[in-house]
């Protein structure tokens, strides 16, 4: 019996979940937010309790110290020695990593080197890895990459139609993201459908603040909507998704506040999407409230959001030459029935039909009608559990 921590570290946050393995029992979970500020927030949930404290956490090393001390303070563990493994979620693994790996110095350097592919994620993840290695140097540390699942894409799918020297010299290509989530929900969908995964064609829709759609053929990713970075694909919470790239130099020339390409990319990453179009919020709950109030900007943002998701799902019906099921997961995918209904209503030609009595908040499972030729499933993703499982698997290889 061992205890494993799954870590999702960002530039100013550290989200964690502690498991008892191999039972896969969640012992505690929490998040440390606003790292680097004097009013950082540490939240711990365990045994039905919730503890929240505001304090000064200047960096990721102090965040990890706080996390470990909280585990002891609240009696969740007795000593640090009870923790035998830690797994880190890494958004971008580039072409270096086709599967999860045990961390060493070279791995950390490569994660940092790939920061350009995930500037909002990889630097914080690397800081989290370094912090754990400093404080718990003797435990097994593992990196689990969002991009690994998508390394099964064929070359004609992952290459962009630009001169090949940009791939050979600079590795410019589609990498995808959310792979851990897409892999998990595809496996769960096969169980739900009672069929082997290697016989199924699935379209998985991870719809959270970040949005990605994946075409899954017999258990493998054959195409996905995120690209060289997680900025590509449908409209998202704060990200634009796909736009005409010629817009970037045009905006630099027109808007004095946008001085260079980095400024435009920052705007596309952080000030666009639902929040940017609506001017209200990047949260679908706020957008739906705007719909009820007939706010025209909320209506416009919502309509663009639905339109872009439908288009990617439609593409992947073509890529797969049909599909057995459409799977919704992540924050909005699991908790926004109106969004699911409006997406599927626009895809009825493919033989999908939602049962309105099942398509309600909190329902998990098959939400399609008996007559629906393509099943529509709602499955809760569990990236943290996937990370913990990979830690346990890799621990066996080095024991």
Curated annotation (Swiss-Prot):
Coiled coil: none
Catalytic activity: acetate + ATP = acetyl phosphate + ADP
Active site annotation, chain numbering: 146 (proton donor/acceptor)
CC annotations in GO: cytoplasm
Keywords: ATP-binding, Cytoplasm, Kinase, Magnesium, Metal-binding, Nucleotide-binding, Transferase
Enzyme kind, highest EC tier: transferase
Cofactor binding annotation: Mg(2+). Can also accept Mn(2+).
GO molecular function: acetate kinase activity; ATP binding; magnesium ion binding
Site note Transition state stabilizer, residues: 178, 239
Cofactor: Mg(2+); Mn(2+)
Pfam family, one: Acetate_kinase
SUPFAM superfamilies: Actin-like ATPase domain
Annotated residues for binding of ATP: 15, 206-210, 283-285, 331-335
Annotated substrate binding sites: 89
Family: Belongs to the acetokinase family.
Protein name per the record: Acetate kinase
Species for this entry: Streptococcus equi subsp. equi (strain 4047)
